[in-house]
Amino acid sequence: RAALAAYGPGPLDPLAAAHAVAAGLPEDAVVVEEAITTGLRLRQVLRQDRPGSYLHTVGGGLGHGIGAAVGRRMGDDSRPVVAVLGDGCAMFGLQGLWAAGHYRVPVTFVVMNNGEYRTLKETLDTWDSRSTRGGRYLGLDLAFGPDSGRHRLDFRAAAEFFGIEAVRVSHPAELTEIVAKSASATAPLLVDVPITGHTPPR
């Protein structure tokens, strides 16, 4: 509630975004989650008790989320599939959107977009602060242009490249409504969700 109450125009608080996804999930939905930092918040608010309703990998590998969601939906079309992905995780398996678009696999892909590999930045801050002096995190901003970190990647454009409809949301209620519609989806959809949490300059 605190996250929702604090919401204002602009990127969503990660906890508010997680609540919005959980609130919209159809009762029989399968969640494929590969969102390292936002996933922690999502697991706090999910209320699923049906076996096979939550798919997540363990260990250090990245990039399974998009492909796992497409495969899960193609293998069993009796349940809606919602993939919750971090922007960094999505970059490791973005080509999986080709299969979703080509075969019209009705998965709802929710990309939590904070514009960076946040968990790696946090690791560097904790274990190796020497390499981040001056606020430089080389290669860890998912951005472009001379003002790196300010222009987040546009996942709508990426989805559209693969023939997938895409939207960007700026309010929790919008996200809840879109996730709820996954129950009757007949085609893939990507939802680009700008979230807060960008690592500030040090």
State what each model feature region is:
Residues 1-76:
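Active-site diphosphate/adenylate-binding microenvironment
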Residues 26-28, 49-52, 76-81, 94, ...:
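Short coil/turn connectors at secondary-structure junctions
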Residues 39-40, 61-63, 90-91, 115-119, ...:
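Short gly/pro/ser/thr-enriched loop/turn and capping motifs at secondary-structure boundaries
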